[in-house]
Amino acid sequence: MPVRWREPVNIKAPVSGDVRVDGPFEALIVLLEEWPDLRGSGYVRARSMCRAAVAGHKDAEDARKIFVVAAKEAKLLH
């Protein structure tokens, strides 16, 4: 069963529109398929943290924090 965050992150994805992201696995999908800038430092850090959280090597809530920072940087956060 995928790890879920205590609180979801709602973003406005360029392709899918409004997206509710409930955990690091869903965040990885958004990062890999929907992200507007694949070179930004926030993107790279969020991708790395979410991968590590999915693998059980990092805390999922820490990955959420990094994902939120990246979403703000990319101007995707609601």
Question: Which functions belong to the PLM regions below?
Answer:
Residues 1-11:
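Short, charged/polar N-terminal "headpieces" of proteins
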Residues 1-3, 30, 68:
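Short, functionally important structural connectors and interaction interfaces within domains
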Residues 9-10, 33, 55:
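A short linear-motif detector with a strong N-terminal bias
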Residues 9-10, 19, 66:
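Generic preference for hydrophobic/aromatic residues in regular secondary structure cores
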Residues 13-15, 71:
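Generic secondary-structure microfeatures
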Residues 15-46:
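A short, structured beta-strand/loop element
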Residues 51-78:
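Short, compact, well-ordered microdomains
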